[in-house]
Amino acid sequence: MTTVILIGVLGAIISAVVGTLWYSGATPMGKWHMQYLGFDKLSEEEKAQKIAEAKPRMWKNYSAQLLLSFITAFFIGFVTSYTVQNGGPASAVYYYVVMIWVAFTAPIIGQNILWGTSEDGLAWKRFVSDSASNLVTLLLIAFVATMMI
């Protein structure tokens, strides 16, 4: 169980790193992210004001995201451990992760975008970016789990 908890902690860190890199201003996905947040239409002063307004609550947002990422990574570690204990290959977790992404993650992201406020031109970009980010994160966590179990 200690290994599964460690996978959860490492997975939360992996998720934070992937998200930071994925949505940085240096990537196309980061530029799309700023567009659908409306930051591309703001002046530098307005951007600075929005960032200053958000700073006091950012620790809560990041803490909540780390907890959610821990839960996801813990589940991947648990499934990998359970599979190996029952005679299955650890690599089966890659299949599980892709199927979880196809069956749950991508549809939920799609629903949020479909019923959300994304502009038509950005909706598909947002769907591709957000769902691909999740898939990359899940596969990296699965890789760590297969190396540790």
Task: Describe the role of every protein-language-model region.
Residues 1-149:
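Juxtamembrane/disordered regions of integral membrane proteins
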